[in-house]
Amino acid sequence: MEKKGAITRRDLLKAAAASAVALAAPMLNRGRYRIFASSNKEYSARVIELVGRSTLIDMLGLLTLDFSKQAKWFANPESFTPADLQPFKDSKINVFHIAVGLGGPEAYLEALRFFASWNGFIANHDEYFCRIDSAADLERVKRSGKVGILLGLQNSDHFRRPGDVDFFHGLGQRVSQLTYNSRNLIGNGSTERRDEGISDFGAAIIERMNKVGMAVDVSHCGDRTTLDAFEISKKPVLITHSNCRALVAGHPRCKTDEAIKRVGAAESVFGITGVRMFVKVDEPTTIEHVLDHFDHVRNLIGPEHLGVGSDIDLYGYDAMPPELNRQLRAGYKGSYGFRDKIDVEGLNHPRRMFDLAEGLVRRKYSDSDIEGILGGNFKRVLSQIWSV
């Protein structure tokens, strides 16, 4: 006998059926909700659900651009507090690829310090963070509730010989960009005057990276070096953080349509960045112009080859102290084309994956497309590359 006014089994079944119908109809936004105490912005139920069920991967996302703060984290584990952790949890990003550019005659020693520091940081805070080493780690990181750290470098100057690839793989390195913006023994960077492609030494390094399961990244590489890498590598070559030169005429850090098509042919993934001068040559520059780059790649090779490589921390370059910002700009050639601002509004805060997902909804991407872009596509290709 069911009591009047009580919640009955029939009511529960009806509610469950209604929920199933709602989940089966993702095109229905079903309202908008404010989910961050620090912001009045509201997000659609569809986007909240998409972010909630996706594995979010930022294939160039630093934990901080304040390197003095980072040095304190390394020197004194207690200096990293729950307040420092909270923005990463709020972002819902599950994996941060924290690669930086190390080069020159001290590259090997600097790389040793880099990996020692980050391995120590992760070990000291293993209740919060985990190192991403394998496809299995990518599968379980979201369930674990921890923030995944993917160790990489944006230059391969630290490889003195092919055997060094094995050594640094043992220290946790899973991605290596062949060059930064300048020439090295492997190939040529994007801002060099001439690009003569991959050297014999570089080909040997790529071969060893394929063998041990370390991803080849060509985001900062010159045009010839980029294409050579696709020809030489037996595994997919990544472009973790770049944009489309067809939309930013002549910018050396953006990739040609030919390079983008190589990504598709290799069954790889291209990560779009929101760095302002890589998005548009003049103002205004908005999130809609960033979305144009997603559309361009989608139209050339399909949404299954798209991902995110923001190339910033959670707050962006424009939030850096002015002197640090000035020093950063001074380290690049004029061809970078810096303007007053470096970031794009809407992608310069911890909630940026939500804003990006809302933009992709506006551009009529399907739920499966968006899940792939937010991280599923990089998860797929990294798992393939890391298999040996």
Predicted regions and their residues:
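N-terminal hydrophobic targeting/anchoring segments and the immediately downstream early-domain regions
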Residues: 6-193, 249-388
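Divalent metal-binding pocket/active-site signature
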Residues: 157-159, 167-253
